């Protein structure tokens, strides 16, 4: 299910393309939920700026896939089907996992908090009925910024940081993980 980093498109995505891509992802999720009546993990990379598909985002994605598989194995949860693809919004993964949806969401939240790259992953868990379990459902604060302690949404809306600073931080986190052989 890994993606080959060297095949990244480096396409600068427009807002309309991004919105269409999100609608297409939602449609794929509904098809998967009909095929597998178990929770669905929908996994993407948080990538600031217009380029969502790069060597860096694919490597971050691949680490996330490895971590999700390890999480399922550790918990004894069966992955019924998994797939990876690249859309205008970057690398995407879907895993149908036979596990209680709320337990799965709590475990993925912990993974996002404990893994060095977890802040760069957006891991959604959908119930078999299609409900997206949110961080808010667990009284968790919104994601924090990569560079400061503010809400990431507030910094993004206000364009608080330079894009190059955010991208450099992403790459530094990835290089640290690769240097330490963290999965």
Swiss-Prot record:
Domain of life: Bacteria
Organism: Escherichia coli O139:H28 (strain E24377A / ETEC)
Catalytic activity: apo-[citrate lyase ACP] + 2'-(5''-triphospho-alpha-D-ribosyl)-3'-dephospho-CoA = holo-[citrate lyase ACP] + diphosphate
Name of the gene this protein is made from: citX
One GO process term, biological-process aspect: prosthetic group biosynthetic process
Protein name: Apo-citrate lyase phosphoribosyl-dephospho-CoA transferase
Keywords: Nucleotidyltransferase, Transferase
Family, similarity comment: Belongs to the CitX family.
HAMAP family the record matches: CitX
EC number: 2.7.7.61
Enzyme class: transferase
